[in-house]
Amino acid sequence: MAKLRITQIRSGIGGTHNQRATLRTLGLRKINATTVRDDRPEVRGMIRTVTHLVRVEEVDS
């Protein structure tokens, strides 16, 4: 299964509660924090919620 490397590039401060909760659910707490997740529809939906705060790259597993 493909993997996604998700990096937080902007702060969640000033965002909605839902955006901050989504960052926490993805495992992102600080700027430049990176996490690797499976490429699943649920994760893609979370990324869509915070697309302006994160950078997403596909990585080989």
Swiss-Prot record:
Gene3D superfamilies referenced in this protein's UniProt entry, alphabetically: Ribosomal protein L30, ferredoxin-like fold domain
Signal sequence range: none
Residue stretches in coiled coil: none
Keyword field contains Ribosomal protein: yes
Keywords from the named record: Ribonucleoprotein, Ribosomal protein
InterPro entries according to UniProt: Ribo_uL30_ferredoxin-like_sf, Ribosomal_uL30_bac-type, Ribosomal_uL30_ferredoxin-like
Entry's Gene Ontology molecular function annotations: structural constituent of ribosome
GO CC terms of this entry: cytosolic large ribosomal subunit
Origin: domain of life: Bacteria
GO process annotations (BP): translation
Similarity-based family: Belongs to the universal ribosomal protein uL30 family.
Subunit architecture: Part of the 50S ribosomal subunit.
Protein name, per record: Large ribosomal subunit protein uL30
Organism of origin: Frankia alni (strain DSM 45986 / CECT 9034 / ACN14a)
Gene label: rpmD
